[in-house]
Amino acid sequence: YFGSIPGSSSGNTQNTSSDEVNNKQKNPQMITMLIPWIIFWTATSFDSRIGAMIVLLVTALMPLIMRNVKFTIWDRISFALVGVLSVGIFMGGNGGFNLIIDLGYLAFGLMWLVSCIIKDPLCAAYVKYGYGGDIAYNNPLFMKTNYILAVCWGAMYVLTAIWSWLAVQNGVGSILIVVNNLVPICMGLFTAWFQKWYPAKMASGK
């Protein structure tokens, strides 16, 4: 009823404008997925309720802040998970704070692991754009490298959830400030090394 007549110039103009908008958007970036999680774990550690409000605000603004970047399914899932976890902290106060933080680690880890089950390693969804886009999925070496890294990151955060819960239950939760920041840094260094070493090693056949 309100649409343009098929074949008319106005219809072509609308399609062209839509294509131009899509072309202006940058390829997905992993930082889009990471920002809500980083702020969630950081802000809530200083003050649970105020931190939760900050996280909810940032999560709500992410589509605007990153309006020039395409979103992946993992970005959207992260927004939803972090939003739900933040509401839980805000509603529960300090009572269930530690449990919800642990659930956050678990959810983040499972997100990485599930991505491997559905044959789309989370990291590959972002890295592929440096290797030709979707065509990179046809490269067995690229996929295997990303499968390994996704499993490593997923397992690390699932284990983080477990040892964080055990540490709090045994009264040594204070060590988590160091451990839970040091371990991801070490994993990041490992990732930077592995993504170069492993493909080179496999390509050489040694």
How would you describe each model-predicted region?
Residues T16-Q29, S45-I50, R67-I77, Y147:
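Short, amphipathic, aromatic/basic-enriched membrane-interface segments that mark the entry/exit
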